[in-house]
Amino acid sequence: QMSYVDHSKSSGPPQPGPMGPMGPRGPPGPPGSSGPQGFTGPPGEPGEPGASGAMGSRGPSGPPGKNGDDGEPGKPGRPGERGAAGPQGARGFSGLDGAKGDAGPAGPKGESGAPGENGVPGVMGARGRPGPPGPSGARGNDGNTGPXGPPGXTGPAGPPGFPGGAGAKGETGPAGGRGNEGPQGARGEPGNPGPAGPAGPAGSPGTDGAPGAKGSPGAAGLAGAPGFGPAGAQGAVGAPGPKGNNGDPGASGPKGEPGAKGEPGPAGVQGLPGPSGEEGKRGARGEPGGAGPRGPPGERGAPGARGFPGADGGAGGKGAPGERGAPGALGAQGATGESGSPGAPGAPGSKGVTGSPGSPGPDGKTGPAGVAGQDGRPGPPGSAGARGQPGVMGFPGPKGPAGESGKPGERGPSGATGAVGAPGKDGDVGAPGPSGVAGPAGEKGEQGPAGPPGFQGLPGPQGATGETGKGLGGPTGPRGAPGPAGNDGAKGEPGAAGAPGGLGAPGMQGMPGERGAAGLPGAKGERGDAGGKGGDGAPGKDGARGMTGSLGVPGPPGAQGEKGEGGAVGVAGPTGPRGAPGERGETGPPGPAGFAGPPGADGQPGAKGETGDSGPKGDAGAPGPGGPVGASGPQGPAGPTGPKGARGGAGPPGATGFPGPAGRVGPPGPAGAAGPPGPVGPVGKDGARGARGETGAAGRPGEAGAAGAPGPSGEKGSPGXDGAPGGLPGPQGLAGQRGLPGQRGERGFSGLPGPSGEPGKQGPSGPVGERGPPGPAGPPGLSGAPGEAGREGSQGHDGAPGRDGSAGPKGDRGESGMAGPPGAPGAPGAPGAVGPSGKSGDRGETGPAGPAGPSGPAGVRGPAGPAGAKGDRGEAGEAGDRGGHRGFTGMQGLPGPAGAHGERGPAGASGPAGPRGPAGSNGAPGKDGMNGLPGPLGPPGPRGRNGEMGPAGPPGPPGPAGPPGPPGSGFDFVSQPLQEKAPDPFRGGHYRLRSPDGTQKLPLLDLAPMDVGAPDQEFGVEVGPVCFL
């Protein structure tokens, strides 16, 4: 503390003479009382690693780590439970031709015709055309699992994996470049006494004061105004929120284009479920369960200071396998499957409706000539009358004149049935008959080749929890990475004495206290608590890349990707079983004429009559009996590609694709809640010297001090002017009132980062990750319950024709009856060649999503995976976003307890001349000098330069272990431009002032009296001890 006494108004006896030369240095004084606690020393060297602590409780979820390397594909899952009954199937295909119809009712009585002889059987007709493809057979048993498909395209990046285990210690990095100049070191121990300094300037004369009585203690000063610290930095990003609820079902999509006509054939009846297979091997780990329910929000922590970004933590232990998820929702309809093998022919359908009459066949060939009639008698030549019915053939008369053409005769009765004509052309296909009864299931077909990959299904909802696996406990995993800092524990016992801390910068001045009586020298105080954690060092160089972390948990399903390109066409399947009979072939060419009948007896030759006009075309004869069945025709050409079938059910999931490359670093998470306030930072550097305060009032006279020891005799001085000898100077008076506060000092460095705040509330759900690759196909599940019956199929082909009815009595000629039922089916043609694969059908409409399954319970924590191999160095991350606005200055902290008295250090180098001391006691009268006029008091001289650095002291005891430095990490630290302060004339360097927003000046706040006390109270602000460095 410095007091300033104004002597300008003093008057009285003559002044003492000028000050004599400085005496020799006195012996050291007794030890002083314990000083106030020093400021926190710099952090000591890191200690040896401690023994491993007990495993901590599981910390809150850390931020998402970087993407781990791709893991191996998982093993196939266990067979799923039997699925629920599927939706009603699509309309079935047309049924097979119906069975031969019953014989029709007897026809109307026909006109009696003379029975003709049966003609010779016609030549075998041409081979029929290939029939249409048969209906699909019943579903065969599931084939064996096909070979794994080719690796899928690289999937999107999975979500960040759990942090990997700590990597092996990297090799020592190269020496770094020289760092920036460090902050000022701690004050050295006192040096050895230096050489005597030059004599100080003459002191101004002291006033003659009679020793005053001891003053009474003053009243306690007012409390200081609160300080303004900066607000803490923003807290860390909260952990991702739980998975949101399923959204409402989307609106129905637009109606798709109508598909082409499906392939025929109804599906067979569902077979009975087979016996249960043997229990399969234990399945691989199931997909992760959904996030647990959201925990209650924690209390809001106080804001902490923002630390440097930490490095990625070591890998956590591998979690326990989750229980099996619930069945997913019904996936979207898959692409059309390949046509199944043709089923066995179904039972005959019921009799079809009578078809329309066929077109008349061509006229049959002329039959052989009949036997000649007997000769008639010759008639007289008639006049040319109307042409009568021909009489019996007479003997030939003379040729009469040509008669006129007779009118056409009435229609004669039907002739005898001619020989079977060549088959007529195919009639039109009759209306489809009703569906036949489903045939029995065909035998299991051979396994077809793997089809092309289906489209990716929509993500299913979260499955229900599976049963807990029965595996034995795994070995103990490696030690997990340290959790975040816990809440402050109870205060521990005082630690052992730390090394002496360096002298801290002065704190802000408190209000003046009462002046205490001088105490005896105190005993050496106990060792103070260890100083607070030092500031974070600059980020170290990037360490070697850590070992690869264990495989991350699969991310949530991604959004549905675009439709992939069709896979390559699979290998042709084996030839299907023989198809159903083909349609009737086209009419073959007429067969050659039959053999001639035996010749009749020769008649007598009649006269050749004139050619009559052609008669009208006769009615078609009744159908002849069926000819013998022709041989099977050759195999017809492949039929045209069938129409697009109904969309098949979802195929089994494809094999797991290789994991995609690591995704880019995600955007920064949202700001976390503010952490708790950090500890009080170290006191800032000395402020600039304040303006000179106004002169305080003179203190009361102090009590008389004890007489000093006599100094050695000086040389006799010349006699001085006679002065009234004054008494010994009194002790220093009380300090005058303080001057007004000086200008605000420069901003100190930021305080150490506070302990981590409690975890923030869970952040909002992150965006849905891209869909991961599908897992490998599990073994087939049990057969599903039979679906509802399909819609009725279209009518089958016409049945075979019924047997001929018995001949009825000859009736009047009826109107043409409807054509009889078609004849019996011919022998089946040879199977047609396999047709080319049809084009993929258009994608069906998306089915509605099934209801979400219930959330499964959380799985047991699995054993930790082994540490991965040492990974390559990661790429530098992008610079983070600029920090938030500068906070307000925090409140001034309480003063710390007094520190222990440090041991005495070695002597330092001689310091510069100190400020002027109080006037010494009068020396012996000097020799007479010339009486000079006292000059005016000169201005204070400039501050002297620092003395040379003293020799380094012995090293102190090792300090307590410092806090762990910030981990090396893969981000580039971009510092703000450093603002430079003017050079300090008393240090040979520059201070560097770092301020977040580039400002050099801090806001000054007005202090009004009412901020400190009532209007009628005096107040002052005391400036504490000043340390000139």
UniProtKB/Swiss-Prot annotation:
Residues 999-1029 form the Fibrillar collagen NC1 domain. Residues 163-182, 310-322, 466-477, 498-507, 531-540, 621-630, 645-654 have a biased composition (Gly residues). Keywords: Collagen, Extracellular matrix, Secreted. GO terms for molecular function: extracellular matrix structural constituent. Gene3D superfamilies: 2.60.120.1000. Its main location: secreted. Residues 67-81, 870-884 have a biased composition (Basic and acidic residues). Residues 34-57, 82-91, 120-129, 136-147, 199-223, 233-267, 299-309, 323-351, 429-465, 478-497, 571-580, 593-620, 655-665, 694-722, 731-743, 830-839, 855-869, 906-934 have a biased composition (Low complexity). It comes from the Eukaryota. GO terms for cellular component: collagen trimer; extracellular region. InterPro entries: Collagen, Collagen_Structural_Proteins, Fib_collagen_C. Residues 13-33, 952-967 have a biased composition (Pro residues). It is found in: Secreted, Extracellular space, Extracellular matrix. Residues 1-990 are annotated as: Disordered. Belongs to the fibrillar collagen family. This is Collagen, type I, alpha 1b.
